[in-house]
């Protein structure tokens, strides 16, 4: 799926995976169509040693532009993140906070990535952080 992505120089680096799998756009991949693995797990396999964090895939670019620092019911809009490296997730969560949103930890890549991919209640919903947290729990 990510045939053009090179692992050169990415070992030990944090890679933010913003991608979503759309078979009609990306072509069909049996392991993704069967939901055996997430696209983030496939990316992590293709970038051994990279510290993959899935983030920014469930928010539209217009929300990133227009809703920076916006509060809904007294809370910032949540952006779900998933990953297997707690320290990498903390770094990405810090970045999300710096740009005016609140990171919501959805768990590891395998489990969490499924919670904020296309077709879920969290995908492009622009929910307050606590509401998003309840949906990914």
Residue positions per predicted region:
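Phosphate- and divalent-cation-binding pockets in alpha/beta enzyme and binding domains
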Residues: 1, 63, 91
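Short, well-ordered alpha-helices that flank and scaffold nucleotide-derived cofactor binding pockets
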Residues: 3, 45, 94
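Active-site-lining helix/loop region of Rossmann-like oxidoreductase modules
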Residues: 74-137
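Short amphipathic alpha-helices and their capping/turn segments at secondary-structure boundaries
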Residues: 1-11
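Residue-level signal for pocket-adjacent positions within structured domains
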Residues: 5, 27, 59, 104, ...
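Rossmann-fold NAD(P)-binding glycine/threonine-rich loop
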Residues: 10-14, 18-70, 88
């Amino acid at each position: 799926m990510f045939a053009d992505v090179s692992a050169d120089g990415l070992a030990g680096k944090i890679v933010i995976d913003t991608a979503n799998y759309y078979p009609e756009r990306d072509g069909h991949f049996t392991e993704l169509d069967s939901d055996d693995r997430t696209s983030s797990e496939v990316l992590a396999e293709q970038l051994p040693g990279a510290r993959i964090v899935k983030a920014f895939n469930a928010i539209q670019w217009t929300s990133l532009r227009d809703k920076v620092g916006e509060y809904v019911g007294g809370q910032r809009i949540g952006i779900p993140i998933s990953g297997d490296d707690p320290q990498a997730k903390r770094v990405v969560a810090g970045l999300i906070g710096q740009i005016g949103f609140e990171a919501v930890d959805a768990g590891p890549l395998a489990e969490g990535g499924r919670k904020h991919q296309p077709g879920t209640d969290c995908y492009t919903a622009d929910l307050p952080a606590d509401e998003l947290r309840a949906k990914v729990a």
